[in-house]
Structures are given as C-alpha cells and as structure tokens.
Amino acid sequence: MAGFPGKEAGPPGGWRKCQEDESPENERHENFYAEIDDFAPSVLTPTGSDSGAGEEDDDGLYQVPTHWPPLMAPTGLSGERVPCRTQAAVTSNTGNSPGSRHTSCPFTLPRGAQPPAPAHQKPTAPTPKPRSRECGPSKTPDPFSWFRKTSCTEGGADSTSRSFMYQKGFEEGLAGLGLDDKSDCESEDESNFRRPSSHSALKQKNGGKGKPSGLFEHLAAHGREFSKLSKHAAQLKRLSGSVMNVLNLDDAQDTRQAKAQRKESTRVPIVIHLTNHVPVIKPACSLFLEGAPGVGKTTMLNHLKAVFGDLTIVVPEPMRYWTHVYENAIKAMHKNVTRARHGREDTSAEVLACQMKFTTPFRVLASRKRSLLVTESGARSVAPLDCWILHDRHLLSASVVFPLMLLRSQLLSYSDFIQVLATFTADPGDTIVWMKLNVEENMRRLKKRGRKHESGLDAGYLKSVNDAYHAVYCAWLLTQYFAPEDIVKVCAGLTTITTVCHQSHTPIIRSGVAEKLYKNSIYSVLKEVIQPYRADAVLLEVCLAFTRTLAYLQFVLVDLSEFQDDLPGCWTEIYMQALKNPAIRSQFFDWAGLSKVISDFERGNRD
C-alpha cells in the first residue's frame, strides 16, 4: 500500500530510507549516504504524487500504536538476557513532532529486534551486564533483574492500561494463596525489591486510587516469593494443596528427610518376594515356650540364641504389632482386666477385638512356616545335632488359654469365646514347653521387669492364668487317651467320661483319673457353653476341630522353681525330655528361607 510509513522507497514518488545496514553490500555506500544526508532535510517526508501532502491524517494511518504489549526478551547465546523494546522507545514514537512518527517502525517488531536507528548513528548491540553486579556473588540469581532496569517499570497510564486485567487476575490468585505485595516472605535484606517510586505518582494522578504497576511488577513480586521460599522450603507446608506445590524448591535438609522417608517406604520385607534363593534343608525341632507373664521366657530365648548361634532360630513375641500397629491391644486388654467390668457386652466386645489381634501374628507366621516345610522328607526323632526353632508363645495362648481365663472372669461372653476358639490351629510337631513358676516368685519378677501396662496385675491374675494353662493341659491329656468324637459326645451331654472308659476294649486310664482330668479341663467349660445349643452343628464342629487340633501338640513341663537363675540347667531339662519323648519329632525345613522370614519378623518387632 503506497504511502505506508516504513516501506522501502521505490521510484521517485516513494519513500526514501536512510537506514544503514551492516551487510557487506551497503558498507561501500557509506560515504555516498553521508553526502546525500548532508543535503537532505532533517525530517524525511514523502515525495511524489503518492505522498499524500496536504491531506489530514484523520484516519490515523500514520498514528503509531501506543498500547503495544511488552515482549519478553529471548535469551542470547551467552545465557544473558537481551533487552527488549522498552516503553521509552514506544513513547518516543508518539511525540508531537510530525516527523517523529515516520522515523521508527510502526509495525510490531520480532522478539529481540531493535527499532531502526536514526541517521548518522551506527546501531550497536546492547552490552549485557554480568549477573554478579545485580544479585551479588553469594545470592540467588534474580530472573527479573533484566526487567527491573528497563523503563517499563516506571509506570504510567500507557504501561498499565492493557495489562491491568491480567494483573488484577494475578492479584486475586495471590490473594487466594494468602500472598500479597507485603508478604511475610519479604526480608529486610531484600530492600532492592521495593515498589517503584512511580507508583505513588500514579496514585496521586488518579486521585488516590492508584492502579497496580502492571503484570510484570507482580511477576517480580512472585519472584520474591520464589527467592525466599527457595531458601526456606519449610514454609511450603502452609501452601500444601495449592498451585505453589508445583515449584521445585530444593532444600538440603528436606532432601535428606525425603530420601530417608522414601528409603523407608520402599523397603519391602523379604517375606514378600522370597523366590530366588538357594534352599538349605536342615532338620529342626519346634519348641514354643509358654507360661504366665514374667516367668522368664524371653530371658531363656536370649540365652539359647547366644549359646547356639546359627543352629537356632528364635521367634520373638510380636509385641510391636500388638502395641504400635493401629491401637495398643496390650494396653486396652489390661485396662479392661483392671477395671473388672464383668458381665457387660461392651467389655466383651473390646476383649474380643484384642484377642483377635493377638492371634493374627501367630496364624500368619504358622502359615508361612508351613510353606517352608519339606514334607517329602517326613519327620524323625530328635537327634543331638538337630537345629532348634524356638518361639515365644504359640497360638494356643492367644486363642485358648487367655480366652478361657477371661471367660471364667466374666469378661468374655460365651459367643465371643466360641469366636476366638474357632481360630485355634496347630501343626504336627509343635511342642509346647509349659514353664511353671510359683505365684510369689512370678510376681517378684513381674515387678522387677517394670512394664507400665503390667502395673495393675496382681497375684490373683497370675493364678487365674496358671489355672487356664492347667485346664488346657488336662484337656490335652484326655486327647491322648480318648478319641475326639467321644470327648465331644461328653461335652454335648450324650454320654459321660466314665461310660467312655468302661466301653473301651483296652482301657489305658482308670475312670477316676479320667473323671478328675475332665473336671479340671477346658471341656467342662465347653459343656456349659454349648449346653443351651448342643444340637447346633456349628458348635459341635468347633468343639470337634479344637479337640483334633489339640491332639497334634506335645507338652513338656518345666518347674522353674527348681532352677533359680540356672538357665543352662533349665535348658538341659527341656532338652532331655525332648530326646526321651518319641512323639516329639524333628521336621525338615528350608533353613535359609525360614531364617530370612524370621529375620524380617524380628526386624519389624525391633523398629
């Protein structure tokens, strides 16, 4: 279109352009342009018939736009910011001089490009300043320093009119995050980030209602937040859940904590992926130490582990699972026992929940141990060189002994007692070592141990626990002489234990002894429990399964009163009974796999 300013000069009626180019072709014409410029007017004017001379500029074709949006300058090859077109360059093209609007380019320049230089002036590239002068050698480089030194931050109506709506939306976003220009993240040593002085002038110009100084000022404020938060990443805690979480703020201490937390969370126990290992088959005898609290089970296990070393696998009591996983079941149980709220349904429900939690680790570990048993090798009698698998308690205590004690104390209802009893399982080869101790000595050891949750236990509690063990032991003796079906018939009231003795073709035990065992056993309690519903098949099946499972066990009795502080002598007694009893047998296990599994259970118990 003819007459458009900034267009190349054509024939003698077009525009004449006096801009020097740095290309090699125009270098030889340098003197020629200088001679012509000596005779040319200071202001370029259009010539010829297409000049439009004498016409009024009503349509605004020659008016330079005044609301150019500021452009972000690209990054140069050296990594420094190339200054962009500033507001000063824009306002210089909008002066009152009629020729000034023709000396610069009215169209939008590409990013990083410079407006045409006036005559007699060779355009020069901007000299970038080193960052060390702006932010100091020990401070974090400021990404907005290149912009603060331009005239765009000087304010003015033209510099804020187009970007005001963007800036207002940005203000609302910062307000939603609890951030503003006077954020608490700003410190005294950041005095170079103050608001430009033109803001007060603009506020006075608008009658006290000053507009914000533009979008880039708020970006600079955002840079202050970024700089401060990068030094104090702990303040991100109050910004949790907001868009500020996308910032990648590095802090040495937080990084170490994150790595430690990630390492802890990704550590998977070997029991989950025990697949690629070389099995080592060894014969081992499984012993389960049982007894009242404080008799010395843990002390004995620690002694045997130190003596036998790799020939022994010690399975500790799962105390951490009982006390630190979800609720503290030990504390809740002792609280119900000491309060003695007998015969209440809510108490029975709480006790049932605790007992079910006590049974979980034993059932899980028994299942895992069963998977590592080499059944093809069978079982054999205990030999002197066999290994030992020593457990701190058996599932028998959690599902039979202590529930029986709680049932007799009226802390557990009949229905809840049946629920716990149904969880009892045992494997052939499990040997129970019942460590008995008189109540006085047991109470002394319990107080010496000094556990807080055991402070409310008294001698009556220990006596009731010993009675429960005795009842289970008497029931086990009955399973060694009578068939499980006959014992269940006695519990259902279909016959008596004396009749069963007389009907036996080869009586092994006298009827008087059998009657005494029955009265002291758990079966006398079971008869009372199932009597109202003795025709129910489920109750009878629970009793039958319990009797059959109980017959799998073997018992070793040790009176600790005879071995006062004599751990080697106590172990000798246990060892000799295991060798003499042909029913106590060793089984073949994958010793390497079992060691890894138990080590993970033991590690979890220590954490």
From Swiss-Prot:
GO MF terms listed in the record are: ATP binding; thymidine kinase activity
Major location category of this protein: virion
Q: Which portions of the sequence form the region Disordered? A: 1-160, 180-215
List the GO terms this entry assigns under cellular component, sorted alphabetically: host cell nucleus; viral tegument
The answer to whether keyword Kinase applies is yes
GO BP term, example: TMP biosynthetic process
Task: Tell me the Pfam families matching this sequence.
Answer: Herpes_TK, Herpes_TK_C
Biased-composition ranges, Polar residues, are 88-106, 148-160, 194-203
- Asked if the record carries the keyword Transferase, the reply is yes
Q: Which residues form the active site?
A: E317
Binding sites annotated in the UniProt record for substrate: Q355, R451
Query: According to the UniProt entry, what is the EC number of this protein?
Result: 2.7.1.21
What are the subcellular locations of this protein? Virion tegument; Host nucleus
Checking InterPro entries in the record gives: Deoxyribonucleoside_kinase, Herpes_TK, Herpes_TK_C, P-loop_NTPase
Reactions accelerated catalytically: thymidine + ATP = dTMP + ADP + H(+)
Q: State where ATP binds.
A: G291, A292, P293, G294, V295, G296, K297, T298, R445
Q: What class of enzyme is it?
A: transferase
Alphabetical UniProt keywords: ATP-binding, DNA synthesis, Early protein, Host nucleus, Kinase, Nucleotide-binding, Transferase, Virion, Virion tegument
Write out the function statement from the record. Answer: Catalyzes the transfer of the gamma-phospho group of ATP to thymidine to generate dTMP in the salvage pathway of pyrimidine synthesis. The dTMP serves as a substrate for DNA polymerase during viral DNA replication. Allows the virus to be reactivated and to grow in non-proliferative cells lacking a high concentration of phosphorylated nucleic acid precursors.
Q: Which HAMAP family match?
A: HSV_KITH
Miscellaneous information on this protein? Phosphorylates and thereby activates certain drugs like acyclovir (ACV), valacyclovir, and famciclovir to a toxic form, that leads to successful suppression of the infection, while the uninfected cell does not have this ability because it lacks TK.
Its quaternary organisation is: Homodimer.
* PANTHER family (alphabetical): DEOXYADENOSINE KINASE (PTHR10513:SF35), DEOXYNUCLEOSIDE KINASE (PTHR10513)
Q: What is this protein called?
A: Thymidine kinase
Q: Which organism is it from?
A: Epstein-Barr virus (strain GD1)
